[in-house]
Amino acid sequence: MTQIGILGGGPAGLLMAVLLAKRGHGVQVFERRADPRLATADAGRSINLALAARGIRALREAGVMTALQDHLVPMRGRQLHNSDGSELFAAYSQHDDESIFSVSRSLLTRELTQVATRTAGVSLHFNHACTGLAADGTPLLHDALQRSLPVPQLSRWIAADGAGSAVRHALQARGVLQAQEQYIEHDYKELDIPAGSPLVREALHIWPRGGFMLIALPNADGSFTATLFLARDGAVSFAALQTDEAVQQFFAREFADVAGLIPALAAQFAAHPQSRLGSVYAAPWHLDEQLLLIGDAAHAMVPFHGQGMNCAFEDCRILDELLADGQPGPFARFSTQRKPDADAIVQMALENHAEMSDSVRSARFNLQRELALQLQRRHPQHFVPRYSMVTFRDDIGYATALNRGRVQQQLLDEMTLPAHDGSLPTAASLDWAHWDAQVTARLTPL
């Protein structure tokens, strides 16, 4: 079978290695960091990950879900914390068996490393950083001291080296692909909430404040990882929070119910890094059939839909199938077939930022959400809320979810047009026979 090299030993690279090795390929993984089983996680370095249907399907096909099960915490919906201190729980789905799962990136990486180590045909090489490409397209590898390392002669290379991909930058520099990195005006910073807090455990907590927000995801040990999303500059921004006093006052004013749950708040705020958020658009993702980008290296996205990891894991599953089907040009086919779905989820992730930070506070938004669930109950084969298509339906491509979501949103906008006095209709006041007909006329069955 083929000898394949994978650049990047994060979750996507490790899953890709396991999938390929199970088909009989020899796989070598090169990771710039030290073995995660020997290292401690850097505080505040990574947003907790949300595992959903697409990622779960890929993990199951690789046979690794059992190893991860104890590290997953189900999140059944959003727990909204309003400025007035009130709270509202909004379930993600009307189906009890549909949840997303919170998982620590460091724990996930360690478990996948263990699985890969035990998988026949996989070799892991730590402290091996890909810093670029040679003239013939093979990677350049260096250790932590920037010393050159030998590069094996392998049939194919897969780059899963993240949003800042050295491989993507090298391909862009030689004109093989076009790429753009688009950063948003908001950065993020993580804070730790220890176990024992009164926060509801099986929920994704959101403190929506319009131009900014705080979220918190549960961990398996009972703690929460909170993340503040805030503008870099301006009157309300990270730039305005340069003193302990400013930080304390900001949290007391905006997040009074959680400020006391974060020990040494000002010290954590000062110690944890402030990181940027952005999207990557690139095409094509391959260099002949020699080299291919997957995951964040090809299509990094902002974290507001919780799909970055799920999309990357779906990449792994689809690429594995293309490599196994015996047809020519699997890298080119992957690049062509997967691009529309990747572009769609990158866009939807950006759109979800506005929803999470602001729209969830709107009466019209919440009415539309109620109506969407009613339409789904009335027309389960025609109307599936966009969030559910993205999160729980791995049989529906991202591009399909985006396009159907636009039609559905137009319907909901029409159903909730305010009256002249600004009042909204109620569900009971709607002409349901009319709207039932509109659903079946505008949406084909799934």
Spell out what each predicted region is.
Residues G9-K22, I158, L191, P273-R361, ...:
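Conserved mid-domain beta->alpha element of the FAD-binding
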Residues T2-G77, S83, D96, I100-L107, ...:
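Glycine-rich FAD cofactor-binding loop and adjacent beta-loop-alpha segment at the N-terminus
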Residues A34, G164, H299:
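Short, glycine/acidic-enriched loop or turn micro-motifs at the edges of active sites
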Residues Q114, H128-G132, G137-L277, Y281-L287:
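Conserved FAD-binding catalytic core of PHBH/FMO-like flavoproteins
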Residues E321-L446:
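C-terminal helical "tail/cap" subdomain of flavin- and related membrane-associated enzymes
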Residues D70-P74, S123, R253-A270, Q327-R333, ...:
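Acidic/histidine metal-binding catalytic segments
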Residues S86-V103, F229, D233:
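Helix-loop-beta segment of a Rossmann-like dinucleotide-binding subdomain
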Residues V103-H125:
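Helical element adjacent to the flavin cofactor pocket in flavoenzyme catalytic cores
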